[in-house]
């Protein structure tokens, strides 16, 4: 136990509940009332705390033993409480009281409470655009399935690999040839006429023969007019009449327009039938020949 006048002893109100602040405030009010004039050398109340802290820092109070069950509060702590009371600052929380603190209610957490936790649902539905753009996963090619059967499977795989190599080699050669042909100049293609349709040949030949018939008739009419204007037909008829009169005594015209155009018409009809039939028969014969020895080879090329 210590005497009340010792510097380390606690005052009457310096307990854990800081009741001394009230007593000191009351004493201060009594001392500074209307009946007492403060001394000129006394510092104002808002500067007393700083003066006391500086004095407490210069001198160190001796250790004081306190009874069990009562916490120790040095005068510096009381001065600090007084300074905080005057300045209006909040006291820092230390010791076990700092470890156990009442958690402040979170408005966001209160909004997220309830059935289904909508806050978490909203957070999961919104995409995260802050990070880099995700890349699509690369798919690995499916590994080739091992063939069953031991030596037989090995032989099949070897044959398949050799066949694939030969196909790739052939395709490569074809590409090389094609590129070489392109570099040379115009593209050339050799083809064979292997078959001719007889029905299409018949139709085409019939149309061509009819067209040639009209051409034939126009040509005959033109020649008849030209030769008639030159007097060939009259001279020929007179000469033939003289020969017939001397021989039989009768005269007749050998050349006339009716005889000439009639003969030309008959010749044209015969040509139509013959040309159509010959073309159709020729198509059949050509198809037979192509089956035996091949068709006519035709080379197609670009223009120079």
From Swiss-Prot:
This is Uncharacterized protein Rv0007. One of its GO terms (cellular component) is peptidoglycan-based cell wall. InterPro entries: DUF3566_TM (IPR021949). It is found in: Cell membrane. Its main location: membrane. Keywords: Cell membrane, Membrane, Transmembrane, Transmembrane helix. It comes from the Bacteria. Residues 1-183 are annotated as: Disordered. To M.leprae ML0007.
């Amino acid at each position: 136990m210590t005497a009340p006048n010792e510097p380390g002893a606690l005052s009457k109100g310096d307990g854990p509940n800081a009741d001394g602040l009230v007593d000191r405030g009351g004493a201060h009010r009594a001392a500074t009332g209307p009946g007492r004039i403060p001394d000129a050398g006394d510092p104002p109340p808002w500067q007393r705390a700083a003066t006391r802290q500086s004095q407490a820092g210069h001198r160190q109070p001796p250790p004081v033993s306190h009874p069990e069950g009562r916490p120790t509060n040095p005068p510096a702590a009381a001065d600090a409480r007084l300074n905080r009371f005057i300045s209006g600052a909040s006291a820092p929380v230390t010791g076990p009281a700092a470890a156990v603190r009442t958690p402040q209610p979170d408005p966001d957490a209160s909004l997220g409470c309830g059935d289904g936790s909508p806050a978490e649902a909203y957070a999961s539905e919104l995409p995260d655009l802050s990070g880099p753009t995700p890349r699509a996963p690369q798919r690995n090619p499916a590994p080739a399935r091992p063939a069953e059967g031991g030596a037989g499977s090995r032989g099949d795989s070897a044959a398949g690999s050799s066949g694939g190599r030969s196909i790739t080699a052939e395709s490569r050669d074809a590409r090389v040839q094609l590129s070489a042909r392109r570099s040379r100049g115009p593209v050339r293609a050799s083809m064979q006429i292997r078959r001719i349709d007889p029905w299409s040949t018949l139709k085409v030949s019939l149309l061509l023969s009819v067209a040639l018939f009209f051409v034939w008739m126009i040509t005959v009419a033109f020649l008849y007019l030209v030769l008639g204007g030159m007097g060939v037909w009259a001279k020929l008829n007179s000469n033939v009449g003289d020969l017939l009169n001397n021989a039989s005594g009768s005269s007749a015209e050998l050349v006339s327009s009716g005889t000439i155009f009639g003969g030309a018409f008959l010749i044209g009809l015969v040509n139509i039938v013959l040309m159509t039939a010959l073309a159709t028969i020729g198509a059949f014969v050509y198809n037979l020949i192509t089956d035996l020895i091949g068709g006519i080879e035709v080379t197609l090329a670009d223009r120079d």
